[in-house]
């Protein structure tokens, strides 16, 4: 039997080694909530939602646009607007360098994408955050493009939808980034006078200056399940008030229970829900 031990194991090792070499990397994803190992292709087909526990993974802005809008007749607005560096800001590396590297990596000029299109044949203007662009932070370009989205919706007499995914104001632009809170809120005040619906969708995370301005000004505020929503983070609040926060504090379910948001909708149902809401809110 010794020849079996000496011959077969090495052969098996060689075969397994060859198989491993032929298997491409990055085929699997472990769910951070339930630890289930998921095939990435299946996860993508399920809109980045875990088929086992329903956990909503973060999704890119482009994927979300493709998920929400009808395929034909999409028009992007403001895609050539680029941020500047008014403060010549420098932390671990210069702001300009950070911008350039992020723009090249994502092929986006900034953290907000504005697209005119249709949801189930209903005209809409959609503004979607790209969280991978510096944490979806709001600077001058995000503010400008959001106002552009508002103006386009007014011009088209259609609903405005914003999908937020942001850590807040962009510190590298200082006071200019904080001014966008007032700028975007003022634009929505104008928008409301036209009696057109603004639907705000809060995904994980929606924090800081974005949550403290236009993200919470929707006629209808929708959140994705378990999304983190708030101004300061839980650890900051706990260290300030010196108290333990309630279980699930700042999660979508907690906010719904306390009347901060209107509804929680599974990502796989959001397109249908939006079409129904817009039909009721803007029958014309």
Language-model-detected regions and their locations in the chain:
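An N-cap/entry alpha-helix motif that binds or orients negatively charged groups
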Residues: 11-21, 29-30, 57-114
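Residues immediately within or flanking Cys/His clusters that coordinate Zn2+
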Residues: 28, 47
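Short cysteine-rich clusters marking metal-coordination/redox-active sites
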Residues: 31-34, 50-53
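Cys/His-rich microdomains that often coordinate metals
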Residues: 37-38, 56-57
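Short, small/acidic-rich helices and loops at N termini and domain boundaries
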Residues: 48-52, 58-59
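Glycine-rich anion/phosphate-binding loops
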Residues: 105-111, 136-151
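A structural preference for short, pocket-lining loop segments at secondary-structure junctions
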Residues: 117-129, 145-169
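Conserved catalytic cores of soluble enzyme domains
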Residues: 166-282
